[in-house]
Regions:
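Flavin (FAD/FMN) cofactor-binding core of flavoprotein oxidoreductases
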Residues: 262-298
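Glycine-rich FAD pyrophosphate-binding loop
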Residues: 26-50
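Short beta-strand to alpha-helix junction loop
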Residues: 61-67, 97-119, 248-254
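A conserved short coil-to-beta-strand element within the FAD-binding core of flavoproteins
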Residues: 128-143
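N-terminal FAD cofactor-binding segment of flavoenzymes
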Residues: 47-89
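Active-site substrate-recognition segment that forms the wall
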Residues: 195-246, 253, 257-266
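N-terminal Rossmann-like FAD-binding beta1-loop-alpha1 element of flavoenzymes
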Residues: 7-34, 323, 327
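Central helical "cap/lid" subdomain
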Residues: 42, 51, 152-206, 268-269
Length: 328
């Protein structure tokens, strides 16, 4: 069998899907350059840090069911960047609190949720603070343009996008009708996230809670997770439908509404220092979900959690599977 030719590949987006894809492509002998609009890799596997506090403000934990991803999680645990999290979990629904009957095995990054992403990224070529805003395919090569730096000098054999569906759509709509159609189905919703830092311990009978039919969908004590230090902080996620409906609210108004709901649930943040983050694209998945997309003729691919059922595991697998197919 003929060995695949080593390629020079551009990968836009350095969240878990992009990092997983890049790591696998590098293992297969390809040269990969990642372009990430944020200051650092991780995407929604992110952790905010203050002088004396930390808070996971994106993905709160993850699970592992697929054998390939279980192997990756085992490696992360061996490298001490992931640990089991066994919280006391409650559920609030119809004005009542009950214990959660979930049997899920939950994992978190240590000392923050971004730790596994940083581990994946450590040997990769990542251009941070680079928003790719234009693409051109000419003479079998991909040409990229960055909003911050202008034309990218490297000409790429292959272009892979590991970004939310709506962002991918803006780049591929004039290039590939099939990719455009998939990106249009991404159905992604935003998420308002509030972080509250307290001087003193908060007395609540749980570490985290699923909240149903309220503005808020999740509250979590960050210090309940392993290897967290500093002052007590809680992460509060608004539910996806409310977040999407009010995605253009001012941060002040979103904070006010979320704090009112938190107080009703028993988490009074009147004495807390609070900040809020708007995730414009936080959740959602294409239906049907093809796991990844690759146009072999155009040398254009898509990966991400939104192509593979959501979740951290879905993102990692999407990137890994795309890399294997690029190589085939």
């Amino acid at each position: 069998m003929t060995k695949p030719t080593n390629k020079t590949i551009a990968l836009i987006g350095a969240g878990i899907a992009g990092l997983s894809c890049a790591v696998r492509l590098k293992e297969l002998g390809h040269h990969v350059e990642l372009f990430e609009k944020g200051r650092s890799p991780a995407g929604r596997m992110s952790t905010k840090r203050g002088e004396d506090w930390t808070a996971d403000h994106g993905a709160q934990y993850f699970t592992a069911r697929d054998p390939l991803f279980i192997q990756q999680v085992d490696k992360w645990m061996a490298d001490q960047v992931v640990a089991l999290w066994k919280p006391t979990l409650k559920v609030f629904e119809a004005h009542q609190w009950t214990a959660s009957n979930s049997k899920d095995v939950r994992y978190v990054g240590i000392p923050g949720m971004n730790a596994p992403a940083k581990q994946l990224a450590k040997d990769l070529t990542i251009h941070a603070g680079q928003t790719i805003d234009a693409l051109k395919h000419q003479a079998g090569k991909w040409f990229l343009h960055s909003a911050e730096s202008g034309d990218i000098a490297t000409r790429f054999d292959e272009l892979l996008l590991a970004i939310p569906g709506p962002q991918a759509l803006s780049l591929v709509r004039e290039l590939d009708p099939a990719a455009k159609a998939i990106a249009e189905r991404s159905n992604m919703k935003g998420c308002w996230t509030l972080m509250a830092r307290f001087k003193d311990k908060v007395d609540l009978p749980f570490d985290a809670a699923f909240i149903n039919q309220e503005t808020i969908s999740w509250i979590c004590k960050n210090l309940s997770k392993p290897k967290r230090t500093g002052k007590e902080s809680w992460t509060i996620h608004a539910n996806a439908e409310w977040s999407q409906e009010f995605i253009e609210l001012s941060k002040e108004d979103a904070t006010e509404k979320m704090l009112a709901c938190a107080k009703k649930l028993g988490l009074d943040c009147a004495e807390a220092e609070v900040s809020v983050h708007r995730w414009r694209y936080a959740s959602g998945t294409a239906s049907p979900a093809p796991a990844f997309y690759l146009n072999h003729e155009l040398k254009l691919g898509l990966c991400g959690d939104w192509l593979n059922g959501g979740r951290v595991e879905g993102a990692w697998l999407s990137g890994h599977l795309l890399a294997n197919n690029v190589n085939s």
